[in-house]
Swiss-Prot record:
It is found in: Plastid, Chloroplast membrane. The gene is RER5. It is a multi-pass membrane protein. The chain crosses the membrane at residues 519-539, 582-602. It comes from the Eukaryota. It comes from Arabidopsis thaliana (Mouse-ear cress). Its main location: plastid. GO terms for biological process: chlorophyll biosynthetic process; response to brassinosteroid. Residues 714-726 have a biased composition (Polar residues). Keywords: Chloroplast, Developmental protein, Membrane, Plastid, Transit peptide, Transmembrane, Transmembrane helix. This is Protein RETICULATA-RELATED 5, chloroplastic. Residues 1-75 form a transit peptide. Belongs to the RETICULATA family.
């Protein structure tokens, strides 16, 4: 029985209908689904209608309903009903979704820009730990948190020999504390012992900008000139940023009276203001301390326990501490419960010590010691703290410009780098082990060393040759710079040779070969010698020889590798040392030039001899007049020691380190600058050498013989070696 169809599926948003397949003897059935949701008067918009159509061309005999048609019709009706009900539900859902407006998507506001924290280049040590003070790593967050938890922060600076480095640290600390105090809505004040308290009104006028720096300077005329220059940046910063300035020093008149006559020389009113009350224990404490110190230093002169000068100085110390303590307590009270006070004074006034007779001990009766924190700036010594002893301070803070010979980096960070790399200390080279023992190897340097060892060739060089290791640790791109220099050396040398020699290029080929080989060898040393190095073994430890040799090697080790090199590890190089580096570097390159010239000219002579042996006719038709090697060596050595030395020192120190460090975020630009500078240096340097060689007679440009010139007759026996490296032609007689 073959089915036939009368129609297809007719679908729209309002209604859908189609005809069921009709078999023989079956009535034509059309299914219609009405989905008109716009008619509100219909109780049910989804209507399914089954219609029996009678066609005019159907006979009455064909309308008979068979048993098979009755059995097939119900399942077809059920399937059609479920199909169109799902279609109508989807259409109604789509219509309702369109009619209901979606709520606007709430966009989160962009996060506020995170202010980049100022990099701290100074070195900080935690002096509160047992044993040797522990260097704090790059993350100084714990230090700042501890400082902010204190109400009073003492900055103890050098008293006998004040340095500019202390003022740099003070400005750095005040600047960072102010930034954090603003975030926590705290008022920051700065108390200065250098200003006597009777100058407070002048400081107020300076803060209100009613007085300029020159007028304020006139009130401290007893200061040395350099002292005002050191304090001026700190004072200007406080005035411009609203950090209150407080004078806490003892008036000069009172201090000089005590130093000359003692406390007895003060008037009754001055004693009440500047001396501690009777029974406080501080005067007796100082007396006993002075007495015991004198007895220990002079055990054989116990009849005179202490001299009058030490006694008067102790009394002056009492007056200074008492005066500052009173001003500090009052300033803390004026600052409220959240204010913060930074006190800049001499280190002897704030050290904790064994007796605790300084400012923290005096103020601890009103302000607990846990709210006071002591920072010593650039102390000369680092004391080992034993169990049961009080620390000398909470932190030791060193300027980045101060040299560091021990315990310079956080040993905990070093251990983390070692563990992450899976390396053992005894498997490292001896100089790095020595540096780890002294605390001179930074985590970054150690990580760079492990990264370099991932390459087999570089690992072999760093393990076997200390010179390569020292240069790669100081500059991981040293081999790249060396490869660039050697790659462009041959090319630029040949181009410059051709530019200068033109049509005589092939006639003067021996000159070209000599200069090219010599340039390739010398370029290695011009990159090697001025390159910065990083060594952890002193010269005295490397050799066991006479003291004079050790002293000479130590002197050479104290000179920078180039005049523009940055200070490494806090080592400060003076102008005289940088000038000495130019002289020493010139002597080294001059020696390289002399040795390379002997080798290059000797090889050129050997090459010519071999060429003459292979082609004997060259000895008749072309006889070379060779130059003495000594003159060439001296001229070339002088050229390297002057022109090349200065040019390569500028490239190594100024271009590839100082400028490259400023552009470290753009490595492609840095490499392009290095490449362009080295190409230009090699090209113009070669031209300078050619001009110098010709001006000194080492090389003279050949004259080209024209066709109408008559060649001069000369015999082979008359051809001798001249004092130039010029190859002259012995022309045969034109018979």
């Amino acid at each position: 029985m073959k089915p036939t169809t009368n129609g297809g599926l007719l679908a729209s948003q309002s209604s859908s209908s189609f005809s069921f397949p009709r078999f023989r003897g079956q009535l034509p059935i059309i299914f219609s689904a009405n989905n008109n949701q716009k008619k509100k008067n219909l109780p049910n918009p989804n209507v399914v209608t089954l219609c029996l159509h009678s066609h005019s061309n159907v006979s009455s005999s064909q309308i008979a309903v068979t048993r098979r048609a009755i059995l097939v019709a119900p399942p077809l009706l059920a399937a059609a009903a479920s199909l169109f009900l799902s279609i109508s539900s989807a259409a109604s859902a789509e219509t309702s979704a369109e009619s209901v407006a979606l709520p606007p998507v709430a966009t989160a506001p962009p996060p506020p820009p995170v202010e980049k924290e100022e990099a701290i280049t100074s070195r900080i040590y935690d002096a509160s730990v047992l044993g040797e003070p522990m260097a704090v790593g790059k993350d100084k967050k714990r230090v700042w948190e501890k400082l902010l938890n204190a109400r009073i922060v003492y900055l103890g600076e050098a008293e006998q020999v004040p340095t500019r480095d202390d003022k740099v640290l003070e400005l750095e600390i005040v600047r960072n504390l102010r930034k954090r105090c603003i975030e926590s809505d705290r008022q920051l004040s700065l108390a200065l012992e250098a200003f006597p308290l009777d100058l407070q009104e002048q400081l107020n006028q300076y803060m209100d900008k009613r007085m300029d720096g020159e007028v304020l300077k006139s009130y401290v005329s007893h200061w040395p000139v350099q002292r005002w220059q050191e304090y001026e940046p700190l004072l200007s910063y406080c005035r411009d940023n609203g950090v209150k300035l407080i004078a806490c020093g003892t008036p000069l008149k009172v201090l000089r009276t005590v130093q000359a006559e003692g406390i007895r020389g003060l008037s009754e009113s001055e004693r009440k203001l500047y001396t501690p009350p009777a029974g406080s224990g501080f005067i007796s404490g100082f007396t006993s301390f002075s007495r015991s110190s004198s007895l220990n230093m002079n055990p054989l002169t116990q009849i005179v326990p202490f001299g009058p000068s030490s006694y008067l100085s102790a009394q002056a110390r009492v007056v200074e501490d008492h005066t500052m303590s009173q001003v500090i307590v009052q300033a803390v009270a004026d600052g409220g419960g959240t204010g913060m006070l930074v006190v800049v004074t001499g280190a002897n006034h704030v050290e904790y010590g064994s007796r605790g007779t300084g400012l923290p001990a005096r103020i601890s009766r009103k302000i607990p010691k846990k709210s006071q924190l002591v920072v010593l700036l650039d102390p000369e010594r680092q004391f080992l703290r034993k169990e049961g002893e009080s620390p000398v301070a909470d932190f030791l803070w060193y300027s980045a410009a101060r040299p560091c010979s021990r315990n310079c980096f956080d040993r905990a960070e070093i251990a983390r780098v070692m563990n992450a790399a899976g390396r053992r200390r005894d498997a490292l080279p001896q100089d790095i082990q020595k540096g780890l023992d002294l605390g001179l190897v930074s985590p970054e340097i150690l990580q760079n060393f492990f990264d370099l060892e991932q390459y087999p060739l570089i690992s072999e060089l760093t393990q076997r040759f200390q010179g390569f290791r020292e240069r790669l640790l100081a500059d991981p791109k040293f081999l790249n710079r060396l490869a660039i220099e050697e790659a462009i050396s041959i090319t630029t040398t040949l181009v410059a040779q051709y530019e200068k020699r033109k049509e005589n290029f092939f006639e003067e080929l021996d000159y070209v070969i000599t200069d090219s080989v010599r340039a390739s060898v010398v370029d290695f040393f011009t990159v090697w010698l001025p390159a910065p190095t990083l060594s952890f073994i002193s010269y005295a430890d490397e050799t066991i020889g006479p003291n004079s040799i050790d002293a000479l090697r130590g002197l050479l080790g104290s000179i920078p590798d180039n005049a523009f090199q940055k200070s490494l590890g806090g080592q400060e190089w003076t102008l005289s040392l940088r000038i000495a580096s130019v002289i020493i570097g010139g002597l080294k390159l001059a020696g390289v030039g002399v040795v390379s010239s002997f080798a290059a000219v000797g090889s050129s002579n050997a090459l010519y001899a071999i060429r003459k042996f292979i082609k004997p006719e060259l000895g008749v038709g072309e006889q070379a007049k060779r130059s003495p090697m000594l003159k060439t060596a001296l001229v070339y050595g002088g050229y390297l020691g002057t022109s090349s030395n200065i040019r390569y020192q500028i490239i190594a120190g100024l271009i590839e380190h100082r400028i490259s460090d400023e552009l470290s975020s753009q490595p492609l630009l840095v490499n392009m600058i290095s490449f362009v500078v080295r190409v230009a240096n090699s090209y113009f340097g070669t031209q300078q050498w050619i001009d110098l060689a010709r001006s000194t007679g080492l090389q003279t440009q050949k004259s080209v013989t024209t066709s109408n010139q008559i060649p001069e007759v000369a015999s082979q026996s008359t051809v001798e070696y001249s004092t130039t490296e010029e190859a002259s032609m012995d022309d045969l007689k034109n018979q």
